[in-house]
Amino acid sequence: MNQEKFKKINKACFLDRDGVLNEDVGYLHKSQDFKWIDGAVEAIKLLKKNNFLVIVITNQSGISLGYFASKDVTNLHEWMNKILKKEGIQINDFFFSEDLPNNNPE
């Protein structure tokens, strides 16, 4: 087995947002409603310390329902990284879907 080949591979951890990193308050899109789940920031620190890429994935059906805009979600994610930067860490990327739970995306 070629060990050098594996040294170049990135490790990644994909985390859901609501209910994993923050308390699920329903249709979260404002920083003032955001509350970290106990241990979430520490878990991200541990992942980063062990050279993992940290990627957040989340379904944001509130966009399709008209409760908020995709820019609101992007702003919240930027705010999350601003808070994490104070802890010396960052989430590498965020991805979200606007689909409703029973929708069949194409």
Protein language model features and the residues they cover:
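HAD-like aspartate-dependent phosphatase fold
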Residues: 1-106
